């Protein structure tokens, strides 16, 4: 009697494992993504720490620019206020400023972007390659988006901050939706003034605001 095919059993920890892999790939920006992925999962299978290094420990590619808030600000100015941008156009912008293609692909994969990209979501994930933590990521996003040239703390509309914080926390997967909601409600009621603006200092210098 022929054997029946056994159903594929997906371990419950797989989604979290893949999410951690994707975040690590954005931070490391490996030159050879396939080889790095093989080394990453081989280390996991042996119970060892995967080859995840912080940016300060990596050597920049000799012919590639390092991702910086300044370069992201240039890209943001080129997007010119659009909420949606086509992937092909954004990829060309990315290429013009000489940023690594692997990093672009990693952000595309983590965000599950297709032909049309929500620019603020893409920008938030690109900033996470620099920020590592959610608070630092949001600080960088605010610096990129801020149009305040008076030398004060970078500032953006609180509605934009709400959108970014909620999205980044969802992608990160380590912070509950209830915590995000609680922090946003506190800031809206106790921190944000009638102008509806939030500054970087509002969420980095206030001990009652714990985004993570």
Swiss-Prot record:
Domain of life: Eukaryota
CC terms in the record's Gene Ontology section: cytoplasm; motile cilium; nucleus
Domain RIIa: 12-49
Domain notes: The RIIa domain mediates interaction with AKAP3.
Its job: Important for male fertility. With ROPN1L, involved in fibrous sheath integrity and sperm motility, plays a role in PKA-dependent signaling processes required for spermatozoa capacitation.
Family label: Belongs to the ropporin family.
Protein name: Ropporin-1A
Originating gene: ROPN1
């Amino acid at each position: 009697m022929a054997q029946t095919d056994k159903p594929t059993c997906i371990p419950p920890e797989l989604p979290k494992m893949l999410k951690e892999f994707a975040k690590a790939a954005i931070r490391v920006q490996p030159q050879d993504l396939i080889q790095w992925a093989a080394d990453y999962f081989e280390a996991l299978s042996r119970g060892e720490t995967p080859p995840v290094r912080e940016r300060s420990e990596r050597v920049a590619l000799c012919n590639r620019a390092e991702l910086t808030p300044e370069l992201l600000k240039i890209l943001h100015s080129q997007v010119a206020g659009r909420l949606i941008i086509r992937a092909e156009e954004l990829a060309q912008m990315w290429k013009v400023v000489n940023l690594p293609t692997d990093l672009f692909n990693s952000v595309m994969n983590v965000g599950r972007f297709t032909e049309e990209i929500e620019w603020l979501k893409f920008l938030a994930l690109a900033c996470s390659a620099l920020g590592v933590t959610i608070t630092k990521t949001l600080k960088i996003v605010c610096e990129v988006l801020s149009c305040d040239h008076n030398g004060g703390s970078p500032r953006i509309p609180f509605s934009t901050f709400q959108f970014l914080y909620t999205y980044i926390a969802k992608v990160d997967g380590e912070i509950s939706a209830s915590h995000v909601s609680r922090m946003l409600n506190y800031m809206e009621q106790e921190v944000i003034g009638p102008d509806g603006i939030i500054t970087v200092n509002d969420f980095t210098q206030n001990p009652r605001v714990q985004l993570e």
